[in-house]
Amino acid sequence: MNRSFLFAPGNVPRRVEKALTLAADAVILDLEDSVAPSDKPGARKSIAEALRGPRKARGYVRVNAPSTPFCFRDLLETLHARVDGVVVPKIESAADLH
């Protein structure tokens, strides 16, 4: 059970790496609102690399909303790392995930 969640912006590699070493039960690495479109490719790479390394916390990736042009690439470039879960924002119903 996750009792605490720590959010970290995916486009700041130092914060991503540091967050994964802290005592939170889960770290949510954000690719959505905290990352400008031009920074998304680097953020995806940073997140994938950090999740493959040593860590204390579970690692979740907060992808962009499925209605955006970024969601598929977020999934494609991060899920091969040791991701414990995916956070999908801006979902109003199950139909939004189909």
Can you describe what each PLM-predicted range is?
Residues 1-98:
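Expand to "…catalyze enediolate/carbanion chemistry for C-C bond making/breaking, isomerization
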